[in-house]
Amino acid sequence: MTANLLDFDLDGLAVFCERLGEKRYRAVQLFRWIHQKGASNFDDMSDLAKSLREKLKVSAQVKAPDLISQHISSDGTIKWLFDVGGGDAVEAVFIPEEDRGTLCISSQAGCAMGCRFCSTGHQGFSRNLKTGEIIAQLWFAEHFLRKHLQRDERVISNVVMMGMGEPLQNYAELVPALRAMLDDHGYGLSRRRVTVSTSGVVPMMDRLARDCPVALAVSLHAPNDLLRDDLVPLNKKYSLAELLNACNRYLAYAPRDFITFEYCMLEDVNDQPEHAQQLVRLVQHYSSGGVWCKFNLIPFNPFPASGLTRSTPERIQAFAKILSDAGIVTTIRKTRGDDIDAACGQLAGEVKDRTRVGERIARQRTFMLKPVSEINTQVKEN
């Protein structure tokens, strides 16, 4: 069976090379060719022995999902749609700024979380992405942008796992992809510049802290369990108390000294002054005295059939002021790419086979009921 080399972190690639009778340093060379130079043709890898190149031609490939479409926003944001087979497609979004280039990556086709304000959740869950399908989004985007912008140096400085899916429900495939992003022979990204966003899969937050502690963002969206049960159904499994305690445990390993809480601003749902005051009390209750979190307020990005409305700018500003006045670092996310449905909460994948939506929703319900022991959490040993 032909192996896709994008599925391996460096250690996995070293094991693969050993099976071919090659030394570890060959894996380093190969890893650099793939991730730093964007090579997919083994004949282009000129410092590899010809004998190794011939072995690779019959046993391996470097294969990213096919690109279906590209959309460029008026603000420079780029959205790519990738075909991952079986009628499924996933999206990645590049957000250019003066001091950074951020890529938003998907981890699943669809999502099992069912958050009310998220278009992906309304699509339902289809399947987990493989490691190669996750890292291929960065591999494609980085080398496409270098060629397009005629630059030799790195274009993407930050990666956020905030695209389609719940990353921590795909733990075994996620971690090797994160390691490839961080590896100096790969993309060499700082742990501070790679962020995993989670709805609050508490046991996997603890695992990530030990295995690959990158920056953490938590989709909070509500100041109490009653409201969060409605907006983020996973809260019925892991309450705010369990989630906030897990956040404090994560801080001991985190590359930053704070956790980011994401809070989608929904008119007349979670945007009242009393909600902000409840958040202040919640944060203070779990604080050990210092600043341990920041809030990122996200204006809701509407999509059909959501039944929700974006809070007014005035209400968002007033909400932010209550948090800031309490000493909580608070930012308001600038909406980017909403004219191409690339803004936060809008990624739905434009799945080619729309006839399977009912099947996906049923699979979503089943997936949500699984105990953690049945979720794919075993990091691959190659």
From Swiss-Prot:
The keyword Kinase appears for this protein: no
Top enzyme category: transferase
Residue numbers binding S-adenosyl-L-methionine: 165-166, 197, 219-221, 301
EC number: 2.1.1.192
Alphabetized InterPro entries for the sequence: Aldolase_TIM, Methyltransferase_A, RlmN_N, RNA_MTrfase_RlmN, rRNA_lsu_MTrfase_RlmN/Cfr, rSAM
Job of this protein: Specifically methylates position 2 of adenine 2503 in 23S rRNA and position 2 of adenine 37 in tRNAs. m2A2503 modification seems to play a crucial role in the proofreading step occurring at the peptidyl transferase center and thus would serve to optimize ribosomal fidelity.
Name listed for the protein in its UniProt record: Dual-specificity RNA methyltransferase RlmN
Organism lineage: Bacteria, Pseudomonadati, Pseudomonadota, Betaproteobacteria, Burkholderiales
